[in-house]
């Protein structure tokens, strides 16, 4: 593919087979007149910038992206409300498949469905009202570049499929969730592992009681909501644990409810604004272990509740 592709009103584009980006920046645009579907049924590769736009319609790629020859950058649905489906991987474990990656905008109301096992990119931002992660164990990876789900007004929920253990690794860069993370009510445990030496920012996790273990490592862990873990299935009857390794910064009132699982905080705990943000830890029968100082830098709010410490 060596030229831009633009359709007429509500026109569609279907590319069947592998797509190699030949030269220059490439844009495929079906957004005219509201939008038409944009479908690629093979793999996409080539050292170029790729921009895909489909307006209110769906953009879908069923093959891998950037395996062999990585894309310089990848932009999908940077205007329009339509959803995005990526059924396979971006890159491989050792090599990123794209540079800077932007999927969706604050206007995106369609679901972004990510079915690949690995999304190895440059700095990556995913924005939509809803996300569905359907692979068995999806891994999002960068080399010292940030990964963000939503930004600005977007606060879409990230839904993990049964047994879709989520792992994000960014070296020393930020990991940011501006919306909630939930599991799927299918009776199979789902774990979350977020790892960076930079800042991890989270809202609510496991509000529907379908998340088992939560393990977060960061230079700073910024919390604003409730982390809930649970026993999810009879086949894995272990209570979900919560482990936070790093300095915990209470951006908002924070609750950890582990329903019998152990809670461990390896680091200090401070309020983002001195004396205003509260912390409640309720582990049921599980142990609570806090190894750092509480309020040493900025005092926590009037409520500090540690049940079964």
How should each PLM-predicted stretch be described?
Residues 153, 183, 269-271:
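Outer-membrane beta-barrel proteins
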Residues 307-309:
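Conserved small/polar residues in nucleotide/adenosyl-binding loops
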Residues 30-32, 105, 258:
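Short acidic, glycine-rich loop/turn motifs
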Residues 3, 11-13, 17-19, 24-26, ...:
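The right-handed parallel beta-helix/beta-solenoid scaffold, focusing on the short coil/turn
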């Amino acid at each position: 593919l060596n030229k831009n592709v633009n359709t007429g009103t509500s026109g569609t584009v279907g590319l069947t087979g592998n797509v190699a980006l030949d030269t220059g920046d490439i844009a495929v645009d079906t957004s005219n007149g509201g939008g038409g579907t944009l479908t690629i049924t093979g793999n996409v590769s080539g050292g170029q910038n790729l921009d895909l736009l489909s307006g209110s319609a769906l953009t879908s790629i069923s093959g891998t992206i950037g395996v062999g020859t990585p894309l310089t950058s990848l932009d999908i649905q940077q205007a329009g409300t339509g959803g995005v489906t990526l059924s396979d991987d971006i890159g491989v474990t050792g090599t990123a498949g794209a540079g800077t990656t932007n999927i969706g905008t604050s206007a995106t109301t369609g679901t972004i469905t990510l079915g690949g096992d690995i999304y190895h990119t440059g700095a990556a931002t995913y924005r939509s009202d809803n996300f569905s992660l359907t692979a068995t164990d999806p891994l999002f990876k960068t080399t010292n570049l940030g990964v963000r789900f939503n930004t600005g007004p977007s606060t879409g929920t990230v839904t993990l499929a049964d047994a879709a253990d989520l792992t994000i690794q960014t070296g020393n860069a930020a990991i940011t969730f501006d919306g909630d993370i939930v599991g799927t009510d299918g009776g199979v445990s789902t774990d979350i592992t977020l790892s960076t030496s930079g800042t991890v920012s989270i809202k609510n996790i496991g509000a529907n009681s379908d998340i088992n273990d939560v393990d977060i490592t960061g230079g700073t862990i910024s919390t604003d909501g409730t982390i809930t873990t649970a026993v999810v299935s009879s086949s894995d009857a272990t209570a979900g644990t919560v482990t936070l390794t790093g300095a915990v910064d209470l951006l908002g009132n924070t609750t950890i409810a582990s329903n019998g699982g152990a809670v461990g905080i390896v680091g200090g705990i401070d309020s983002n604004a001195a004396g205003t943000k509260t912390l409640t830890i309720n582990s049921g029968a599980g142990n609570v272990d806090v190894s750092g100082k509480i309020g040493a830098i900025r005092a926590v709010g009037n409520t500090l509740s540690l049940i079964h410490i």
